[in-house]
Amino acid sequence: MDNNFKIKDLPKNERPQERLIRYGAEVLSNSELLAVILRTGTKNQNIMMLASSLIKETGGLDQLFNQSIEELTKIKGIGVTKAVQILALSELSKRFKTYKSGNEYKINTPLDVSNLVMEDMKYLKQEKLKILILNTKNIVKYIRDVFIGTLNSSIVHPREIFCEAIKKNGASIIICHNHPSGDPTPSKEDINITLRLKECGKLIGIDLLDHIIIGENKYVSMKEKGTI
């Protein structure tokens, strides 16, 4: 059983839900906010203890929100239901961070790209390649994952990249991929892929504006490095 201790079993002045109602969500700690979402503890831990240990065990909210359902359910006290709640909360937080009024996100600098994809990519355990398709005003109209796995120029085919841009009537594209090591320093393959896509873009009239490599809370822009 994983529902022996509930929020209502805590003293009223210690219940995070009561504190939120009385004082506002901003006064609650991360553990308290997580406790409000998860609601129930375990046989040996009340919900506050469980929420606190969960954040500590995973290394903080960033790491917690990048766990897979398999990883979460290996943690003592976390079943499928709680894992699903955490994953849903994680996805909402990522979407909110990239939300813009009117659902428009304009790219002016490489930092704008990083802000858009960092939360989703910085802790991935495999390399993932994303394509951002922009209109003539540099507003992101479409984002798609086009490849997962070790990137090299023989696998990443320009046809797959630019086919999406053509379908969506894109004026230009930006590609992003992550380095699971956390170090965004470009490899020779990264540079080769960038140059190949740049030349293909020129031929078909859809410019490659940048190639952003994501590390752990840092990034490298091929445009800033002069590769593009």
Swiss-Prot record:
InterPro entries, sorted: MPN, RadC_JAB, RuvA_2-like, UPF0758, UPF0758_CS, UPF0758_N
Lineage top rank: taxon: Bacteria
Any GO BP: proteolysis
GO molecular function, a single term: metal ion binding
Binding site for Zn(2+): 177, 179, 190
Entry-linked Pfam families: RadC (PF04002), UPF0758_N (PF20582)
MPN domain: residues covered: 106-228
The keyword Cell cycle is annotated on this UniProt entry: no
PROSITE patterns registered for this protein in UniProt: MPN (PS50249), UPF0758 (PS01302)
Keywords for this protein: Hydrolase, Metal-binding, Metalloprotease, Protease, Zinc
Residue stretches in coiled coil: none
Motif (JAMM motif): 177-190
Signal peptide bounds: none
Family membership: Belongs to the UPF0758 family.
PANTHER family hit by this protein: DNA REPAIR PROTEIN RADC (PTHR30471), UPF0758 PROTEIN YEES-RELATED (PTHR30471:SF3)
Name of protein: UPF0758 protein CLI_3057
UniProt organism field: Clostridium botulinum (strain Langeland / NCTC 10281 / Type F)
